[in-house]
Amino acid sequence: MKEPVSSIQAPSRHAKIDFTRQWQNFVLGFQHLLAMYSGDVLVPLLIGHYLHFSTLQMTYLVSIDIFMCGVATLLQLKRTPLTGIGLPVVLGCAVQAVTPLETIGGKLGITYMYGAVIAAGIFVFLIAGFFARLKKFFPPVVTGSLITIIGFTLVPVGFQDLGGGTPTAASFGDPANLLIGFLTIAIILLFNAFARGFMKSIAILLGLLISSFIAGALGFVSLKPVSEAAWFHAPQLFFFGVPRFDMSAMITMILVSLTTMIESTGVFFALSDITGRQLTTNDLERGYRAEGIAAILGGLFNTFPYSTFSENVGVLKMSGVKSRQPVYYAAFLLLLLGLLPKVGALATVIPEPVLGGAMIVMFGMVGVQGVQILHKVDFSNNANLLTASVSIGLGLGITMYPQLFQHMPTEFQIILGNGIVVTSLSAVLLNLLFNHRWANHD
């Protein structure tokens, strides 16, 4: 008589455990969402304002962007024979594309802007196999340098938000901004140091929420974006018109896509190191293809190219949860928020100092992940020492002074004005020079 009772009770117990785990995954996914949300919606806002979009156009642009972030993320999460790297990666608008797209849209028109995005997506899809085979040129001295520079060059973005967002504004650096920003950092650190289990893994989310409530009590939160947003918005093909194509615009966006592929490579290797999963050439190929398809869909639905978000590497590192399940929840939440702009607008009311404090922690974690990879490198070998030091030095310098190449053609500025790209190119070339060519002559 006891055996049937036990067979009935066991499923109930397992169902409860599964429900708890799924709830925790949902909350972790929400943490991933908040980490990338403001950085993502910034891209359509910047481009829309530059091109003088109407309120209706801006509403569509932000909504479809959020929706397509969910689509792009799902493309990467699920490994298929064609696409998907299968790592816990979140995709968002490629911020490197902002200035080129503004230039194309301003000079040629909106439809040419989307034609260039589609062309860049097709290019990424077609060269995915070739680019993936360059994996052998990314040993730890190269990937470590690249991931270090990705993290540390983005830390100033966090400080800018912590100060209030716009350095030229009179309120920038206001003591209230600094108090809220550093309070966010303190809350994240306290939960990470003293909390246990699940509460520790959502330290960033708790820091964002608690600091936002405090900031709201101090009058830093405005719900105007929520009241102005529509309740529902459906994705629509060719909302701004059928894409048109111009050779110079397409070449410009293809160059931008190369820079995003290089940055994505760094993020892929960072996630590989965190999760302990070795990446194959086929993995990388599927990952690049997913980004190519996401860009093509972006052009068709009149939005933008998409790339991996390094913020979420910091979230993953901090939480210690390496599963893809939370990111699936983040992707589905993005789809939902893209359809319900009024709900999605809630995430935009988080004050900039709060986001800045969280960004400093997240980007710092990404940089330290790169340092951990460099720890595996034999620096008693001067070739490795020179490769890392020169590459990181060039990346930091160009990040501080991107105008260094302002007198060069635009095509060169896109490549050489990006510290992450320069670090990657420098590390690959110096590693080949020192560790291969010269080694063969010893």
Which residues does each PLM region occupy?
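Membrane-embedded helical hairpins/re-entrant loop segments and their flanking transmembrane helices
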Residues: R13, Q22, G48-G84, T252-R324
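Hydrophobic, membrane-embedded alpha-helices of multi-pass small-molecule transporters
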Residues: W23-M36, D40, G173-I185, I202-A203, ...
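N-terminal signal-anchor module of multipass membrane proteins
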Residues: K2-V89, Q96-I104
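Intrinsically disordered, low-complexity non-transmembrane regions of multi-pass membrane transporters
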Residues: M1-L28, L223-F238, D273-R277, G287, ...
